[in-house]
């Protein structure tokens, strides 16, 4: 599949989707984009910058949601112009899709909305690449129906994203079998390594997380053989206004990406490993 200006597939070198969970300020957006662009250029990893102008799914009504549509899109446009990087952002049921699609390069649908047929159809009908997150409540084989709905719009630029499955209360588990199953649906598969360690509502009025397991799961997904890795990162996760508990410190991204690139190269170029994946 052609994604912006590079080819993506489950057997091609992986690409990265990364950035802060939510746009907190113009400075934070530009700073994280600059650091990530420098690292990915050095490691030759195709990079898509992500951040949200509005986080609709929040544990508490008092939680920070973002800077809003107009300011958020202005900042994303500035990131795109300043660093020449493609942009991904979330859209929701009442998002003015035309306005967002005029700025960003990839649209992302939230996991909780993956079964909403009209929503998925409207987003995919924009003709932009779409990253569809698998619901925490959904079996991986059920995503083939979501792919069919999406591609029925005529849009072939559809990706599937695994972000963990509900495992009792306030917990998620990442089942690597899900990646293998979804790879059979003729769509690039992305693994969300940071939301997969989230503890939804685990802190009462906010979600917790176990960021120490992000590198473990990211390496496991790369070993399975995926098209892309999604990770949220922040210079100071403890001060992040959304999902800090499961965000990777920005200072740790270089080392982790070096590991992932080395493993990805092994899995996708070694003939024996290619047979296993």
Curated annotation (Swiss-Prot):
Entry's transmembrane regions: none
According to UniProt, the reaction catalysed is: D-arabinose 5-phosphate + phosphoenolpyruvate + H2O = 3-deoxy-alpha-D-manno-2-octulosonate-8-phosphate + phosphate
Q: What are the GO cellular component annotations?
A: cytoplasm
- EC assignment: the record states 2.5.1.55
Q: Which GO terms describe its molecular function?
A: 3-deoxy-8-phosphooctulonate synthase activity
In its UniProt record, which GO terms are filed under biological process? keto-3-deoxy-D-manno-octulosonic acid biosynthetic process
User: To which pathway does this protein belong?
Assistant: Carbohydrate biosynthesis; 3-deoxy-D-manno-octulosonate biosynthesis; 3-deoxy-D-manno-octulosonate from D-ribulose 5-phosphate: step 2/3; Bacterial outer membrane biogenesis; lipopolysaccharide biosynthesis
SUPFAM superfamilies from the entry? Aldolase
Is Protein transport among the key words of this record? no
- Compartments (UniProt record): Cytoplasm
Instruction: Say which domain of life the source belongs to.
Output: Bacteria
Keyword list, A-Z: Cytoplasm, Lipopolysaccharide biosynthesis, Transferase
Per the similarity annotation, which family is this? Belongs to the KdsA family.
Q: What name does the UniProt record give this protein? A: 2-dehydro-3-deoxyphosphooctonate aldolase
What organism does this protein naturally occur in?
A: Dichelobacter nodosus (strain VCS1703A)
